[in-house]
Every structure is written in structure tokens, then in C-alpha cells.
């Protein structure tokens, strides 16, 4: 699915990291659930709702997460960021006001070599607070 999203459709936000489902750089949402696109056949997406990092740009969760990641310095090289944000968006769609422990658990399948995880977790927790105050689920 990752090759189709990037090469055919032109949605290049979904990254190729390991190709084995270990790093989370290729995370997308399929019917609201996070999946590693490198392990998903494109044909399996037929008739399903697929959301990439580009799709989150118009979504309030995506906007708030983007702002929180910038505010907390949760981005350095940026390679892992799309997968992290997509994974965090799925968490915030199902969990109001996640604490740090819940946020850490949610991103266990996403690897970051540059920033480390504390700033990312802080960004997710803050985004959850903002969205809860706004009444966004």
C-alpha cells in the first residue's frame, strides 16, 4: 500500500523506513485503525477509508497535533513525524486526555532516532488537553 500511496497517488508523507513493520514510519489509518502500510496490500484497501498524514491536515486532531509537535520541539529530522502524528491521531480519536503512560504505549510501534520520546509524548498529552477543551473527539 505504501508504494501505491507514494508512487501512484503521490501522497509522499507516508515514509518508507524498514519495510518490515518495525519502525512505524509508514503508519496510516484504515477505517480509523492504524496499520503499517508497508505490510498492507493495496488491494486490501479497496472500499475502505484510508487516512494518511496529508488527510490529517484538514482534521482538527491533525492540526492540533502539528501545533503541539512544533511547540514542544518534538520534530528534528522529521522522518518519523508523519507516522507518529497518524498514530497519535488514532489515540486521540478514542481516548480523551491521555496521560503520558497512555501516550507512550500508543507510540510503542513508532521509532525515533533524533528527538527521543519525551517531547513527542508531551506534545500528544497537550494535544489531548486542547482537543478535550474544544470538545473534539
Regions found by a protein language model. Give the residues of each.
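Signature of N-terminal electron-transfer/Fe-S-associated modules in redox systems
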Residues: 2-137
